[in-house]
UniProtKB/Swiss-Prot annotation:
It is found in: Mitochondrion outer membrane. Changing residue 266 to F: Found in a family with Brunner syndrome-like behavioral disturbances; likely pathogenic; reduced activity. One of its GO terms (biological process) is biogenic amine metabolic process. The gene is MAOA. Its cofactor is FAD. This is Amine oxidase [flavin-containing] A. It comes from Homo sapiens.
């Protein structure tokens, strides 16, 4: 075969070729190398990191314009980063967070804004309790096997929210909860998939929290260092600017071709790119029908990440920490976090433009986006200082042809039960990594490490270096970032929903009326 001759002549023979130089692909390559396996990583971009990307310049020192956050229970990425000599620091929430709704700012502390209306409180409480309870039915490694999988997969998350919530207040916040966590709209995503997504991130409180949650920490120096330091370890085993165009496993060895017509030969392939990008590669033989269908049906979320830098952290003058939850259709940003450096230098606020808003605001000039964001911060924080930033950075992930969007791919209704079970299934000697294939913290850097190392162990099993039972490995808890168990009060567990309250009121009214009738007509004894 001509390709085989080219590969042999060039001497490009490896045990494994990894497609994709993000955290998942590089985690796989690192583990394989530790077992003495010859590996080559082919990365399409001129950098490693995938959906993590640390920009460095004189204005910001360093800034994560992609994935950045880590927290308790994310033990694999914490172990890997520690091994690479990368430290974490806590995102600042020492001062008060703020909720902005209907043109007013409400300071608060804790994971979720407080609700003072008693009916709305019952609705909120029932919403979080219901999402968590439904999630308990869903196996993290096989959500399509949940008892109610077919029913829930036919529903959008909007339909489920509208079914659960009685008040506009709870419904509006629930829609925002979907936007923030998966950068897509409630009407776009399967209820089954979203319930699974929240469950495998530890539940509604863990996924949404800063303290003791998914956004507790960042890396000193930026998350891009994880991939960069693995690349340093691997040396010339990583090739940048090498988009893979062909994978041919029709012969004894697999032949890989890149866009610049270089050829590489290997025994196994690990595909560590977003599922939809697999469609850019020509396979021989063709991919199985279910895999081919799956990769056409998993769109990427939409987000523009925006960092606004100021001379000083003026928000702290009002005892605000910089975290804002913004419920306003006209507001460009939906949620913010303090992005000041751990030593207090370079004060900054990070904000996300999410889902429908990312699409809408991407059409505007960068300076107009910047102006709108500053005006919003001035309103929410009640300070004209917000109008005078010293620098602005942004990253529209929808423009990235080798990502397609961020944070992660999502499952529209009907896809998980029909095609989801093939997400990790090997195709011949091709194995699949990427955060979308993880079973815990999928969509995060943690999920990327889990998926990459699992795919590496699948290959190691094929090479006879590990047993099948060692493919899935339990990760011990991080001693440096221990998790605190999330508990709920008696009232949170037992308060009725709004509909439950109405039933109680209706029953009580009926009993009272019946008693009155019986008493009036002397059917009850009188004392």
């Amino acid at each position: 075969m001509e390709n085989q001759e080219k590969a042999s002549i060039a001497g490009h023979m490896f045990d494994v070729v990894v497609i994709g130089g993000g955290i998942s692909g590089l985690s796989a390559a690192k583990l394989l190398t530790e077992y003495g396996v010859s590996v080559l990583v082919l990365e399409a971009r001129d950098r490693v990191g995938g959906r993590t990307y640390t920009i460095r310049n004189e204005h910001v020192d360093y800034v994560d314009v992609g994935g950045a956050y880590v927290g308790p229970t994310q033990n694999r990425i914490l172990r890997l980063s520690k091994e690479l000599g990368i430290e974490t620091y806590k995102v600042n929430v020492s001062e008060r967070l703020v909720q902005y709704v209907k043109g007013k700012t409400y300071p608060f502390r804790g994971a979720f804004p407080p609700v003072w209306n008693p009916i709305a409180y019952l609705d909120y409480n029932n919403l979080w309790r219901t999402i968590d309870n439904m999630g308990k039915e869903i196996p993290t490694d096989a959500p399509w096997e949940a008892q109610h999988a077919d029913k829930w997969d036919k529903m959008t998350m909007k339909e489920l929210i509208d079914k659960i919530c009685w008040t506009k207040t709870a419904r509006r916040f629930a829609y925002l909860f979907v936007n923030i966590n998966v950068t897509s709209e409630p009407h776009e995503v399967s209820a089954l998939w979203f319930l699974w997504y929240v469950k495998q991130c530890g539940g509604t409180t863990r996924i949404f929290s800063v303290t003791n949650g998914g956004q507790e920490r960042k890396f000193v120096g930026g998350s891009g260092q994880v991939s960069e330091r693995i690349m340093d370890l691997l040396g010339d085993q990583v090739k940048l600017n090498h988009p893979v165009t062909h994978v041919d496993q029709s012969s004894d060895n697999i032949i890989i071709e890149t866009l610049n017509h270089e050829h590489y030969e290997c025994k196994y392939v690990i595909n560590a790119i977003p599922p939809t990008l697999t469609a850019k590669i020509h396979f021989r033989p063709e991919l199985p029908a279910e895999r081919n269908q799956l990769i056409q049906r998993l769109p990427m979320g939409a987000v523009i990440k925006c960092m606004m830098y100021y001379k000083e952290a003026f928000w702290k003058k009002k005892d605000y920490c910089g975290c804002m939850i913004i419920e306003d259709e006209d507001a460009p940003i939906s949620i913010t976090l303090d992005d000041t450096k751990p030593d207090g230098s370079l004060p900054a606020i990070m904000g996300f433009i999410l889902a429908r808003k990312a699409d809408r605001l991407a059409k505007l000039h960068k300076e107009i986006r910047k102006k709108k964001i500053c005006e919003l911060y001035a309103k929410v924080l009640g300070s004209q200082e917000a109008l005078h930033p010293v620098h602005y950075e942004e990253k529209n992930w929808c423009e990235e042809q080798y990502s397609g969007g961020c944070y992660t791919a999502y499952f529209p209704p009907g896809i998980m039960t029909q095609y989801g079970r093939v997400i990790r299934q090997p195709v011949g000697r091709i194995f699949f990594a990427g955060t979308e294939t993880a079973t815990k913290w999928s969509g995060y850097m943690e999920g990327a490490v889990e998926a990459g190392e699992r795919a590496a162990r699948e290959v190691l099993n094929g090479l006879g270096k590990v047993t099948e039972k060692d493919i899935w490995v339990q990760e011990p808890e991080s001693k440096d970032v221990p998790a605190v168990e999330i508990t709920h009060t008696f009232w949170e567990r037992n308060l009725p929903s709004v509909s439950g309250l109405l039933k109680i009121i209706g029953f009580s009214t009926s009993v009272t009326a019946l008693g009155f009738v019986l008493y009036k007509y002397k059917l009850l004894p009188r004392s």
